[in-house]
């Protein structure tokens, strides 16, 4: 007849289980070293015994594996962990012949804090539409040059020489546009100088003319005499003019 393990219930089972745990407690515990200090870490209500031989670090960037009993602990350096992810902009290759030109051009037009030499009246004057249109075209061409410089930086960074033709063509186009901009600037400057001369001449004439009298030129005098005399014999010929 088969034998079955005895079953225990209630308080009797609890007492027997307690005695069993006490009997096996000494089999799984090692003698403690009096020189080493133990620490108890509580994780989710579970007590875990950890000795000094296995330090546990959490959320720390400094790793120091030495303990208090080591005499040379002060001589060992602390090792700092490097960040896993770093964001750094890739610099433009130094062997690129157009990188310096592109950088200087960007700095020139981004840091242009000089005030305009035009006054409010000159900017809003209807006679200066042609000048402002020229300046707008110059601004557009400068923007195109900036775009071409950026394209040159990208194109010249390639490892192959297949883009040399494109790069040379763009350099030639850039030189042509710079020459056109120089011509536009000179024409605009000449027009501004001419307007300044006319304005100065008109100012000088207004300063000299202080009387209200109007002087007639010879042709105007003949016409005036003809109208005042009402004489049909005093007809004017082409030679009089």
UniProtKB/Swiss-Prot annotation:
GO terms for molecular function: protein homodimerization activity; RNA-directed RNA polymerase activity. It is found in: Virion; Host cytoplasm. Residues 232-241 are annotated as: Binding to the N-RNA complex. It holds the Pfam family Pneumo_phosprot. The modification Phosphothreonine is found at residue 108. Residues 58-77, 201-241 are annotated as: Disordered. Residues 201-211 have a biased composition (Basic and acidic residues). Residues 216-232 are annotated as: Binding to RNA-directed RNA polymerase L. Keywords: Host cytoplasm, Host-virus interaction, Inhibition of host NF-kappa-B by virus, Phosphoprotein, Viral RNA replication, Virion. Residues 90-110 are annotated as: Binding to protein M2-1. Residues 1-30 are annotated as: Binding to monomeric RNA-free nucleoprotein. The N-terminus is important for viral particle assembly. The oligomerization region is central. The C-terminus part contains binding regions for the RNA-directed RNA polymerase L and the nucleoprotein. This is Phosphoprotein. It comes from Human respiratory syncytial virus.
